[in-house]
Amino acid sequence: MTQLENKHCVPCEGTAAPMASEELQRQLSSLPEWTLVDDSGTSKLVRVFTFKDFQSALDFTNRVGQLAEAEGHHPALLTEWGKVTVSWWTHAIGGIHLNDVIMATKTEKLV
């Protein structure tokens, strides 16, 4: 992992710009399991985590929720039998901010 796992999210005003493409690609090199997805013009970091059963997926979902509350930055979570889809983006700017990369990095540590 990178040093990002030791950083914390900072409040992001709606005036902040989404992360530049070159910087985002550089950051994603340390997150090979994450995919950059364009959802109706909004860039998101997305990863599907797989588990042996629903309870394991639910436990992971709760750990991500606790992390999100602690950092004040919240993902979209889809919990299904044996898998959880985590999507990070910054609603206020309609794209990806350094906070999202920090949170994706921290999410990796929860598995």
UniProtKB/Swiss-Prot annotation:
* The reaction(s) this protein catalyses: (4aS,6R)-4a-hydroxy-L-erythro-5,6,7,8-tetrahydrobiopterin = (6R)-L-erythro-6,7-dihydrobiopterin + H2O
Record-listed E.C. numbers: 4.2.1.96
Q: Which InterPro entries match?
A: PCD_sf (IPR036428), Pterin-4-alpha-carb_dehyd (IPR050376), Pterin_deHydtase (IPR001533)
- Gene Ontology biological-process annotations: tetrahydrobiopterin biosynthetic process
Q: Which UniProt keywords apply?
A: Lyase
State the superkingdom.
Answer: Bacteria
Q: Name one GO molecular function term.
A: 4-alpha-hydroxytetrahydrobiopterin dehydratase activity
- Membrane spanning stretches: none
Q: Which family does it belong to?
A: Belongs to the pterin-4-alpha-carbinolamine dehydratase family.
PANTHER family from the UniProt entry: PTERIN-4-ALPHA-CARBINOLAMINE DEHYDRATASE-RELATED (PTHR42805:SF1)
Please identify the protein, giving its name as recorded.
Putative pterin-4-alpha-carbinolamine dehydratase
Species of origin: Chlorobaculum tepidum (strain ATCC 49652 / DSM 12025 / NBRC 103806 / TLS) (Chlorobium tepidum)
